[in-house]
Structures are given as structure tokens and as C-alpha cells.
Amino acid sequence: MSSVIKVEQTLHGYANGHQLIAASVKINAENKRLIDELSDLSGICEEKNFIDYYTGYPIDDGKKYVIAKTWYAYEKQRPGCVWTHSLILDTEDIRKISCMRIFEKLFTRPRINDYNNYTNTILYENTGEDIDSQYDMEKLQYVIYTLFSSAKPRYVHASEVHLEEELLFMVKK
């Protein structure tokens, strides 16, 4: 059974400060502040050792969920600049996605002055094919527990190739 899922998107980057560069949807002030903050560089980074990373968080009182990917903006002259492509979905739609690997294809690293694609809503055809069943659920439960069992911020270094997509898989559970 196939269904179409609507995915809104934003692009943040450096333009006289880290800010929203393009969006497919109008974002209210409260959500904009949160997305602006969470799309900026997380922590200290050295350009040569920068590792792309994902961020996920709810907006609109949990009705929507943002999954974002951040890259170092090597092409910018100012040190510490990043690009962040955020995908905004209805929380209920995330549970319908059968294969979380789709996010690998939806995230697009921008090119300077080529931002038009980020102003379009993405219509993702969910085929219902479940190929996420290969994940080690015990390991994922441990990672999720590590991340969320404390009020202190935590991180997990994703040294294994598929850990990122496995964590995305857990978002829908």
C-alpha cells in the first residue's frame, strides 16, 4: 500500500550571521527561533575534523518533528560556518515511513547561491516496503537510553556506518 507523505524543508547557513536562507513553508516565530538555534554549529569544531551530524527535535507542541543534517560550509570564508538542511514532517507521518533510509536521499548539501530546491515541498511516496527490520534492537535501546535517561546533554559517537540510520529508525517507534 502506497501513500504520499508531505515533507517541508528549510535551509540554514551563513549570510551575515547564521540564519534561514530558504524554506518551503512559513514558520512561526517560536519555531523559527528554535530551528535557527538548533541548526547552528553544535559545539566546538575544527574544520579538518568536522563530522556531519544529525539533529532531531519536536516543534508545534509535538505535532511536527524536525530531522536535520548539518555539514561544515568549507566554501565560506568565515571559520565555523555550517549548512543545515532540515526536514519537517507531521509526527504521525514519521511512524508511517517504512524505510528511514529515505532521509539519506532527501538530505541535500547546498551549493552557493543555488537554494531554489529548498523552497519546494517534498512529496515522498511511501511504498510500505519495510527494510528496516535488520537493526540490532538491543543496541538501539541502549543508545536511546543513554541519550534520554539523564537531564544532562549526551551524545553518541556514531563510529559504525549504519548507526545514524538506525537512530532515525528509532524516531518512528
Residue ranges of model-derived segments:
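N-terminal module detector in large eukaryotic regulators
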Residues: 1-173
